[in-house]
Each structure stands twice: as C-alpha cells, then as structure tokens.
C-alpha cells in the first residue's frame, strides 16, 4: 500500500488539525519567542516605549493562540509571525533609533539615519502578509488573487494605524519631543516611508505567490480555496 506524503506549503492550510501538544515545530517557535522576549524585556533603553511597542505584540500572541483550534495556520505562517515579533522586540529594546543592527547598516551602507525601523516595516509587509492571505483564502473563501490583493491593503492599513497610534502616544507622552525624535529621527516623512516599506514587502510576497500560481494555473482569477 502506497502512503500519501503530506505536503506543507505557504498557501495550503493543513488538512488535519494538529493539537498544540503534538505540534513540535510550533512549540519550539513559541519557546524561542518567549525566551527572546524575556531577554529583551530586561533593561530596555526606555521601559515605557518598550511596553508601548510590545503591547500589541502580546495581543497578537494571545489572539493567535485563542484561534488556534478554530483557524489553524500553516507553521510557515506562524514562523513568519514569530520572526517579525522578534525583529520588532529587538527594535523596541533599543527604541529602534539605537538598534545595533541599524547602526551597522548606517556605517556599512552609508545611511544618514538608523534604518532598522525601515527594515522591520519591510519584514512586516513580507512576513505578515502571508498569514493574512492564508486567512482570507482558506477561512473567508475568497478567490486567490482577491486574497493576495486584500492582504496588501490590510498590511498598509495596519501600518497606517500604527503610525496614528504613535502620534497619539507622543501627544500623551511627557517626553513628547524625545519620543518623536527616537521614532522619526528627524525625518518628517517617516510615517509615509514606513508605510511604503510595508507595502513593498507585501507586494513582493504576494506578487511572488501570484507568479507561482500563474505558472501552475492560468485561470488564477477563478481559483478558490478547496473545501
């Protein structure tokens, strides 16, 4: 009897609901994130900014865990979410403007500012657009190309909302000027450039997915998620 080999991919959700206690890769990802989060939570440059920046991250983890049984994603999507949260936690530890990775990029590539925030925005668009698309395609039963396009809009919307929340936080902060400088680093177009980088990352990922799908099925606009 020939056994069927289970296929795992970015665009195909698992056909079998795996209990969390048996999902070793996901357990490992969660353990890595918890350890990294705990380490970066120790002595951040600015503790208030740290908890402000990571409040939403903790909410994402809670919501993702709550919907694990009802709407399980592929482990590749979970890996993308975890990697973004780690990159974000690292930036928040150094208030982004002082992140060593960005300082290295600044010296090596000749940037005029610490561009780690741009890197994280690019990663947000690239990594998080995949699970968003997966939810739209498999849970909401949208056509494949619709799911890809709408996921791009969702990424841009979330990035814009984050920029607005930073403005509100700065308005309520006692050290308003310090917060603005640490986030924008003197760039008056900081929010727009962050959104553009998120858009670029999402477009690259979704564009690649559409290209791969087109090579396999020319009628991509008619493709819906299988029941």
Specify the residue positions occupied by each region the protein language model found.
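N-terminal membrane topogenic signal
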Residues: 14-31
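Hydrophobic alpha-helical transmembrane segments
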Residues: 27-31, 51, 77-79, 149-153, ...
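"…centered on the first transmembrane helix and the immediately adjacent amphipathic helix/loop
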Residues: 32-126, 130
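Interfacial helix-loop-helix junctions of multi-pass membrane proteins
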Residues: 49-50, 101-102, 116, 159-203
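Membrane-interfacial alpha-helical segments at the cytosolic side of multi-pass membrane proteins
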Residues: 59-68, 123-139, 172-177, 195-212
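Internal alpha-helical transmembrane segments of multi-pass membrane proteins
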Residues: 140-156
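Membrane-interface capping segments at transmembrane-helix boundaries
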Residues: 210-220
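Short, highly charged, low-complexity non-transmembrane loops/tails of multi-pass membrane proteins
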Residues: 219-227
């Amino acid at each position: 009897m020939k056994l069927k080999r289970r296929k795992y991919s970015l665009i195909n959700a698992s056909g079998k609901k795996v209990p969390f206690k048996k999902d070793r890769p996901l357990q490992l990802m969660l353990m890595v994130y918890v350890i990294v989060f705990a380490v970066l939570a120790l002595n951040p440059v600015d503790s208030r900014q740290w908890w402000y920046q990571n409040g939403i991250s903790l909410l994402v983890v809670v919501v993702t865990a709550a919907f694990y049984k009802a709407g399980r994603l592929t482990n590749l999507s979970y890996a993308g979410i975890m990697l973004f949260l780690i990159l974000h936690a690292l930036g928040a530890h150094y208030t982004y403007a002082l992140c060593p990775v960005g300082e290295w990029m600044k010296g090596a590539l000749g940037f005029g500012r610490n561009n780690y925030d741009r890197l994280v925005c690019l990663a947000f668009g690239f990594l998080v657009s995949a699970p968003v698309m997966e939810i739209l395609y498999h849970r909401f039963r949208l056509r494949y190309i619709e799911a890809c396009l709408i996921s791009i809009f969702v990424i841009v919307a979330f990035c814009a909302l984050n920029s607005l929340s930073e403005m509100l936080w700065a308005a309520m902060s006692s050290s308003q000027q310090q917060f603005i400088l640490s986030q924008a680093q003197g760039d008056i177009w900081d929010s727009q450039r962050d959104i553009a980088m998120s858009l670029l990352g999402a477009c690259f990922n979704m564009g690649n997915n559409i290209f791969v799908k087109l090579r396999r099925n020319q009628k991509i606009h008619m493709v819906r998620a299988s029941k």
